[in-house]
Each structure stands twice: as C-alpha cells, then as structure tokens.
C-alpha cells in the first residue's frame, strides 16, 4: 500500500510508511483469525522467525524515527523502490516456477536461517512497510517442511507479520507520523476484502495471483522514482 499512497495520493513517505504499517496490522489480524480458527498456523516456525524479526523491527523503528527527527528521509524513497522491486521479482519468480520444483530439491534449512532472515525482514519492513508478506513467504517456503500445505504457509506468514507491523506502527504513532483519517478510509474499503480473500484462499490459482501482483509491483518500482 505504501507505494500507492506515495505515487497515487502524494502522501509523504514517512507518513505513508507509518499509516500502512498500522493498516497492515489490523487487516492481518482479521485474516489470521480466520486461518487460525482452522488450525493452520505453524507456531514453531513462527517463533523462530520472531526471534529475529522482532529485534530487527525495533532497531529499524528507532532508525526511522531518528531520521525523521533530523529531516534526513530522502533516501527512504529509494529503499522502498528496492524493496518493492525485490518483492515483485519474488512474486514473478514464484509465478513462473512450478510448485513441485520449488520444494523437490530443497535441502533442510540451517537453524540460523529463520532468525537471520526474520531480522532482515523486520529491519526492512520497519523502514519501508514493504515485503513482510511476500519476502516472509519466500523464507517460509525455504525453512518449512516439504509437505507443508500452502494454507498453512499463508496462515503462518500472516501471524508472523502481525507483531512486526504492530511494533513499528505503535512506534510511529507516538512519533505523530500516522494519518488517522487516511487509515480509517483504507480500513473501510479493505476489511470486507480481507474477509472474502481469507475465505477464498486456495481457490484462486496461486501462480496467477503471483504473476499479477508481481507485474503490478515491478511497475510501481519503475513509477515511484518519477513521482
């Protein structure tokens, strides 16, 4: 949502990041409540990711608040462009790659990969609000058992992202960066979609969704520097 807020609605970069993080927290809570009720969450993997992502998001939040205080936020746009492009590339790669191929040759992941990867995601999300879902999913595919069902991966990814977005969002709330009117408008339009999307997960071909979203994100990565 951050790239759209910046390029389509001319929202200031720090405000877009802060507002999008709170928006993501609320919408993901609703989604994971539906998935969690079905018993789909892998708590062991989630805790391993949190061991790295929560410290990472705390560090990133402190960095961003410090930069905003000093007025040194120009480089945030380029960091967002990098994360949007990386997220789009990950989605396109997933869309063009057969699911069986992605996991058939996968060796067991080293135990340090989940905390280290989680730390990178936490740091990046707190500075850009981009990539928690897609990059988190790419990491989950690598560290989860080969026979993990897609619905379980989705639910685990959603649950992992909630405190990551929430901690950063709360930090930015106390810094006065959240646009509450904009947040309310976003939630008004999105929450019905979250409910429908969670209930329909698994019925829409994953490769089609990955390709469509990947193309959109790569396009946004090209447009953002021009705004």
Language model regions located:
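Membrane-embedded alpha-helical segments of transport systems
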Residues: 22-31, 53-59, 63, 159-167
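Short hydrophobic/aromatic, small-residue-rich stretches within specific transmembrane helices
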Residues: 20-24, 50, 157-161, 182-187
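Generic N-terminal helix/loop capping motif
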Residues: 7-8, 19, 25-32, 36
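Membrane-interface alpha-helices at helix entry/exit sites of multi-pass transporters
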Residues: 11-22, 42-48, 145-158
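Juxtamembrane transmembrane-helix boundary motif
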Residues: 2-8, 13, 34-127, 138, ...
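Extracytoplasmic
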Residues: 1-2, 133
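Structural signal for alpha-helical transmembrane segments and their flanking helix-loop junctions
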Residues: 111-171
């Amino acid at each position: 949502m951050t790239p759209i807020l910046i390029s389509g609605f001319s929202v200031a970069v720090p405000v877009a990041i802060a507002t999008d993080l709170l928006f993501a927290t609320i919408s993901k809570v609703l989604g994971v409540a539906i998935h969690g009720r079905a018993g789909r969450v892998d708590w062991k993997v989630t805790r391993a990711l949190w061991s790295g992502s929560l410290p990472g998001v705390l560090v990133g939040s402190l960095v961003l608040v410090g930069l905003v205080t000093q007025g040194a936020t120009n480089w945030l746009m380029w960091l967002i462009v990098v994360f949007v492009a990386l997220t789009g590339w990950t989605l396109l790669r997933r869309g063009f790659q057969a699911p069986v191929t992605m996991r058939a040759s996968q060796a067991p992941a080293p135990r340090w990969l989940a905390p280290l990867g989680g730390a990178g995601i936490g740091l990046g999300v707190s500075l850009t609000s981009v990539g928690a879902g897609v990059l988190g999913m790419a990491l989950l595919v690598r560290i989860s058992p080969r026979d993990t069902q897609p619905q379980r991966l989705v639910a685990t990814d959603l649950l992992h992202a909630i405190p990551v977005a929430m901690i950063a969002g709360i930090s930015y709330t106390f810094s006065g960066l959240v646009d509450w009117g904009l947040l309310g408008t976003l939630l008004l339009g999105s929450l019905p979609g979250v409910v429908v999307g969670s209930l329909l997960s698994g019925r829409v071909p994953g490769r089609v969704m990955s390709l469509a979203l990947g193309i959109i994100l790569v396009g946004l990565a090209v447009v953002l520097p021009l705004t």
